[in-house]
Amino acid sequence: MVEVVSVREHDRWRGVYVVELEDGSLRIATKNLVPGQRVYGERIFRYNGEEYREWNAYRSKLAAALLKGLIELPVKEGDRILYLGIASGTTASHMSDIIGPRGRIYGVEFAPRVMRDLLTVVRDRRNIFPILGDARFPEKYRHLVEGVDGLYADVAQPEQAAIVVRNARFFLRDGGYMLMAIKARSIDVTTEPSEVYKREIKTLMDGGLEIKDVVHLDPFDRDHAMIYAVMRR
């Protein structure tokens, strides 16, 4: 087991920590909200009485976006976030660490089998609220979700940007942030990724979202990008 030499909070990403190991390598991590719990087999680091979970960029598109130079991490302590396509909770668990017990993640997932996996994660993570539903129809879970500070989407649907806009109009406050992981091949297998990205960005802009940054996630995820935007009502 590689020993931890030091842990410090990242200069720009609040709630994200840089772990230095004795072999000289650096890893990013979040402080574990549920000490002792692993979510996806990630490494656990212990230092000065605290426990940190390695944030694996090959398993989490948000971690990949940070390592690829996303201008900022808008997620912060106490935030309320709507997560579309939460799946089994890999990325959401790190967001859960960052927002802490005062924050809340409303996690929408369409697949019952995947939802069962998520339920094992949220049993101890009281700030994640799972919703079995279809992100295309936000009106069907409107009664379960309060207004949110942020929206994160990873739904791999052909109309992903339109789905995001629909949900943003329902739930995202003015000035709230949106992070959308986009896989070009899930939207249109016949079109080059750059053209797909442009088309989806136009849909977001037409829906009132001001684009702040777009980063491509190679080599962590081929043909993926992360779009960061802010809602302007």
Curated annotation (Swiss-Prot):
Record keyword Methyltransferase present: yes
UniProt keyword annotations, A-Z? Methyltransferase, RNA-binding, rRNA processing, Transferase, tRNA processing
Pfam families found in the cross-reference section: Fibrillarin
Q: The organism sits in which domain of life?
A: Archaea
Q: What does the record give as EC number?
A: 2.1.1.-
- Quote the InterPro entries the UniProt record gives: Fibrillarin, Fibrillarin_CS, SAM-dependent_MTases_sf
Molecular-function GO terms, alphabetical: histone H2AQ104 methyltransferase activity; RNA binding; rRNA methyltransferase activity
Report if keyword Membrane is assigned: no
Q: Which PROSITE patterns match?
A: FIBRILLARIN
Q: Which residues bind S-adenosyl-L-methionine?
A: 90-91, 109-110, 134-135, 154-157
Q: Name one GO biological process term.
A: tRNA processing
What does the subunit section of this Swiss-Prot or TrEMBL entry state? Interacts with nop5. Component of box C/D small ribonucleoprotein (sRNP) particles that contain rpl7ae, FlpA and nop5, plus a guide RNA.
What family classification does the UniProt entry report for this protein?
Belongs to the methyltransferase superfamily. Fibrillarin family.
Q: Which NCBIfam families match?
A: PRK04266.1-1 (NF003275), PRK04266.1-2 (NF003276), PRK04266.1-3 (NF003277)
Q: Explain the purpose of this protein.
A: Involved in pre-rRNA and tRNA processing. Utilizes the methyl donor S-adenosyl-L-methionine to catalyze the site-specific 2'-hydroxyl methylation of ribose moieties in rRNA and tRNA. Site specificity is provided by a guide RNA that base pairs with the substrate. Methylation occurs at a characteristic distance from the sequence involved in base pairing with the guide RNA.
Listed name of the protein: Fibrillarin-like rRNA/tRNA 2'-O-methyltransferase
